[in-house]
Each structure stands twice: as structure tokens, then as C-alpha cells.
A protein has these predicted regions:
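Ankyrin-repeat boundary/"N-cap" motif
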Residues: 2-7, 32-40, 62-68, 92-98, ...
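Conserved ankyrin/ankyrin-like repeat signature
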Residues: 18, 50-51, 77, 110-111, ...
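Ankyrin repeat domain, specifically the short helix-to-loop turn at the C-terminus of the second helix
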Residues: 23-28, 54-60, 82-88, 113-121, ...
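Ankyrin-repeat and related helical/solenoid repeat scaffolds used for protein-protein interactions
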Residues: 158-206
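Ankyrin-repeat-protein effector appendages
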Residues: 1-9, 53-68, 153, 186, ...
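Ankyrin repeat A-helix N-terminal signature
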Residues: 9-14, 42-48, 68-74, 102-108, ...
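Alpha-helical adaptor scaffolds
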Residues: 125, 132-141, 145-148, 152, ...
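N-terminal segments that cap or nucleate solenoid repeat domains
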Residues: 2-32, 73-92
């Protein structure tokens, strides 16, 4: 196995010590490209927190790109990047994810605020396979604070993603009462139907979330 392959495997397996060892013998590999874009993004996507720490400890902050800074939640680096005229805050990466979508999905509230302050489109639907906005991505990631920030910034709580799911469908299926309440408070439709005909109440019931079913009923959901 080459050092390149071994390093990618170590990142995916969250083997921080192995990442450090490979870096010692070949430090230039840390900025090698990967299918996800960079090793930092590979670590974030796979939830490899130990590997991510090893990578960030060995990566100069000014080497992080827009997508890495968004996904890892580095507001200081974001401010520097976005202060440069060449930065394009709404441009998706090769996988179709925007900086705001990455910060939202991975629960980086400070990064979300910086991106919004620099003109990120809160309702942009990038060409990713999930076809979701940043708010919907934050709901999928179960990040209540980020959803609140985006909703207060004008995020559409009734936008549709793949198979016509709304954010309320996802929150109801997750069983997150606070998220359901927040979405309803911002105008989410409790009777929206997705492909297959299910409403959020139907999805909550199928997942066994009785408290969510009761909550939705009190907020206008039909049986």
C-alpha cells in the first residue's frame, strides 16, 4: 500500500496516531487531493474526529480553503478568505455542496453567521445529490442552533428536498420535539406530503414518536 492510500485509509478509520506517523515520514501528503476534495474534508465527512485533529494540528490555518474552513467551523479563516475579492461565497464544491451547506450540516454556528454576513444565499439549492438548502441540511444534521440562525435569516422552512421531503418531515422522523416546534413557529406546514403521501405526523407515528404526533396535532396536523 502506498503512503497515499495508507493515509486516506487511516483518515477514514479515524486513526489519528497513524496519520501523525505518516506525516512524519511524508509531510507533503497532508494536502493531497482525495475524492472528497481534501483529507480534511474526508475526515469531516467520515466523522473521523481524531484524524481531523491530527490533520488540523499539522495544517497551517492559512492553507485551509473555503470549504474546509466552513466544514470545520473556522470563522477567523473564513473572514480572511471572504475578504478577498476572488472568494465566491455561494459557489458549490465539486460534490455540489456550498460553504453554507457544509457549515450548516456539520453544526458550525459561528461559521454560518460569518457566511451569512458575507452574502451567503440562505435559500440556495446547490446541485448536490441531496438537493437541500442549508436549513434543511442543518435539520438533517440535527443542529437546532444552526436551524434557528438560518430560519431567522429568512430560510424557507417549507422547501422540498429529495423525494419531496420537507424539513418538518425529517425533524418529526428524528423525534426532535424542539426542532419540530422551531420549524412550526417559523411557518412549517404540518400537513405537507412527501412522495408516498406521508405527512410529518405519519412519519413520526411510523417511527414511534408519540410525543411528536401529539405536538403536531396541537399545531394543526390532520389525522
Amino acid at each position: 500500500m502506498t503512503d497515499e492510500d495508507e493515509l486516506v485509509a487511516a483518515v477514514k478509520a479515524d486513526e489519528g496516531e497513524k496519520v501523525r506517523a505518516i506525516h512524519e515520514r511524508n509531510p507533503f501528503l497532508l494536502r493531497m487531493p482525495t475524492p472528497e476534495g481534501t483529507l480534511v474534508l474526508t475526515a469531516v465527512y467520515h466523522g473521523s474526529n481524531n484524524a481531523l485533529k491530527a490533520l488540523l494540528d499539522r495544517t497551517p490555518e492559512d492553507a485551509l480553503n473555503l470549504y474546509e474552513a466552513s466544514a470545520t467551523g473556522n470563522p477567523r479563516r473564513l473572514k480572511t478568505i471572504l475578504g478577498q475579492s476572488r472568494a465566491r461565497v455561494n459557489d458549490p464544491n465539486p460534490e455540489g455542496f456550498t460553504p453554507l451547506g457544509l457549515a450548516a450540516f456539520f453544526g458550525r454556528p459561528e461559521a454560518v453567521r460569518v457566511l451569512l454576513d458575507h452574502g451567503a444565499d440562505v435559500n440556495q439549492k446547490p446541485p448536490s445529490r441531496f438537493a437541500n438548502t442549508a436549513l434543511d441540511a442543518a435539520v438533517a444534521g440535527d443542529h437546532l442552533e444552526v436551524v434557528r440562525i438560518l430560519a431567522e435569516a429568512g430560510g424557507d422552512v417549507n422547501v422540498r428536498s429529495e423525494r419531496n421531503y420537507t424539513s418538518l418531515h425529517k425533524a418529526a422522523a428524528h423525534g426532535n420535539a424542539d426542532m419540530v416546534r422551531l420549524l412550526l413557529d417559523h411557518g412549517a406546514d404540518p400537513n405537507a406530503t412527501r412522495d408516498g403521501g406521508n405527512t410529518p405526523l405519519d412519519d413520526a407515528r411510523e417511527k414511534g414518536h408519540a410525543a411528536i404526533v401529539d405536538l403536531l396535532k396541537t399545531r394543526g396536523a390532520n389525522e
